[in-house]
């Protein structure tokens, strides 16, 4: 059902990649679209070998990942997971942006990341930003504004973007009476 509805698997481990494959999701890019993307801040040898073998786009959360991929598979499709310098979540544990977060390439290093993409002959597919889980619309609007500025930086570096992602983080009501997600409002922010 999820595959038929166009859901993309954002895997964060080799095990999740294998589960997605076992569930019928197809690796690689198809008409510019991927069923599976791998997101991390580092690559171990086994995961690196598997994403290269299957041509799974990698959402790179560190500069080292760009060098690792470029060394073994020039042309590999990548996303850049950018830390915009701010984060928000329903608790400190779910805040994945800002100076205290380990996640993502710091927004001020985007030009250097673009240079690494070019020097490693990688193919930039998109920009990704995830500031936390349990995010409200005010903070998501901040993400949208930050993303537009980052797109301008990438364009100024002569790289093409095919997609942008504000990540997840939408608050989900767990109990009756909690606010529901207004998807139309969320999309209107863009």
Residue ranges and their predicted role:
Residues 1-163, 172:
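Active-site-proximal beta-alpha core segment in soluble small-molecule metabolic enzymes
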Residues 166:
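Structured binding elements
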Residues 171-190:
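Anionic-ligand-binding alpha/beta catalytic cores of soluble enzymes and soluble regulatory domains
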């Amino acid at each position: 059902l999820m595959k038929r509805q166009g859901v993309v698997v954002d895997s964060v481990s080799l095990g999740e990649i294998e589960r997605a494959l076992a569930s019928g999701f197809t690796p690689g890019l198809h008409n510019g679209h991927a069923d599976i993307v791998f997101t991390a801040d580092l690559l171990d040898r086994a995961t690196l070998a598997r994403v290269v073998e299957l041509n799974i786009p990698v959402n790179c959360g560190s500069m080292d990942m760009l060098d690792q991929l470029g060394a073994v598979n020039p042309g590999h499709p990548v996303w850049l997971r950018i830390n915009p310098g701010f984060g928000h979540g329903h608790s400190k544990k779910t805040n994945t942006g800002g100076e205290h977060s380990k996640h993502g390439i710091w927004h001020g290093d985007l030009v250097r990341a673009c240079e690494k993409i070019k020097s490693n002959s990688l193919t930039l597919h998109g920009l990704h930003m995830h500031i936390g889980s349990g995010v409200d619309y005010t903070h998501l609007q901040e993400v949208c504004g930050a993303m537009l500025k980052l797109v301008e930086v990438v364009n100024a570096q002569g790289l093409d973007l095919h997609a942008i992602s504000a990540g997840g983080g939408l608050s989900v009501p767990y109990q009756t009476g909690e606010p529901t997600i207004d998807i139309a409002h969320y999309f209107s922010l863009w």
